[in-house]
Amino acid sequence: MLSLIALAVAQSGTVEVPFKRAENAIIVDAVVNGRDLSFMFDTGFSGAFVVDHNISLGKETGTMRLRDFVGEFDAKTVKLTSVKLGSKVIDPAEMEAVMQPADYSFSYDTHCDGIMGFEVIKKNVTEINFEKSKFIFHPKSLDINSRTPDNKRTFLLKMLPIGHNAIKLDVRAPNGKQLLLSLDTGNAFYTTTHRDVLERVGLWTKDSKPKFVKQSFVASGAVDSWTKKIEGAKIYGVDVPLSYWDIIDLPSGSAESDGTVGFGFLKNFNIIIDYDRRRVWLENFTGKVGNDPEGSTGVTAAFDERQNRVRVFRVIPNSPAARAGIQMGDSVLSVNGQELGGRIGYREVAALLDGPVGTKVTINFSRNGQLMRMELDREAMVNE
């Protein structure tokens, strides 16, 4: 272990580590406490690792309290003795792995043993290069603060002086009011905030009800959410003429956070993070900054462990599914000819049901033993 720590200190040049881009996530291989594992990289998680509790990393040494968009919960931890990403050795001092019961491969629809958080890269000048699917660990001598951005394709940002082990950056509503949104590669959506935050900055009228409400899944459970059309926001210094945000229909759980900017926005940029100097560099390589509304049938479905089948958990009122008579509790047998007979992740189910606005999807259902076949349009379930 001492030799690994010495090597971590000695590494001073540029080190590149490839990662895999899943549909809405970064998957990276790492050796943790001698185990070869794969992780979803999540800058929104302030710790080091969250690992499936069925994987042995050593004796449990403590507990950690975790927070997501919905609430808080406690999990057991294991002290880390070694961490390595490719040829990059990470000093594991004071790092812990949270041991949590979860099937991450099931969640991310690719082999995944857990989550790698911001703490792993925090002490480095780290580039998340989406363009070439790799991390670039730059030498400490690289000072992005000396760069001059053009504020069209390149942007230099100062981290806000709030939060712990988090990258809080400035976001402005169309009326200029500030939102505190963390840079969060683990959020699969474009931008996620809360209903009370929209009310505070004047983007939603208090006590008014959204027309289209769906259900989203986070670590602490299911939560009502909906999509809001936003025109003229400025996200991390970038002018965004039109975008669609996911809104959690619960109050924000922290005065220091209004939500996060997620994968849907970040995937358009190469990002350099220098936490010690409190600076972030963005390079827009795709030419895109906004997102398109998701085409939805109005069905929320997921695998039911007790019934051993995919079942409908919610039908959005006034949606194509509601108009077709689909009901909560119906079993989903196949989507566009793909059988759903085995265990399948909710992200994969959603990817089959949803798609571009204006396209169609054919779904086979069963209800009380009776088979039904329906062709549904995918529509934009957007709240103006």
Model-derived features: where do they sit?
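Pepsin/retropepsin-fold aspartyl endopeptidases
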Residues: 8-384
